[in-house]
Amino acid sequence: MFYERSCFIFDLDGTLIDSLGVWSQVDQELMRRLSNGRVMLSEDEAGTLRIRAMKTYGEGSDAYLKYMADLKRAFDLPGTPEEIHFQRYSLAQEFLRTRVHYREGAAELIKYLKALGKKLAIVTTTRRRNIDVY
């Protein structure tokens, strides 16, 4: 089939690893903790808030600080946007270590292709520091 090819390129998130829902889970837990259980978002609600913020502010640290400021205002959360962002980052690192796993068959396929001497590449928009946690 494709095994005669010498190089394979894989997308990371959602293809090799099942990480797409983890960001909504991070935001759910962040809101629960910061509000002492007063704010309980569904995974869909958390995802919608984050996606809306990224569409409004773009990507990058500044966008996430603005997103944290929005959450602070909307839900009357304690702390500065910077403090909330730091807590989100810490929580995300924990979730990435403990909740993100290879998709079924992905690890075996990578090992098989490597054993065949194929060149492998991974592409992603994920920040390197998060990839290192996976």
Task: Outline where the language-model segments fall.
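N-terminal helical cap/lid subdomain that shapes the substrate entry/recognition surface
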Residues: F2-E104, Y112, L116
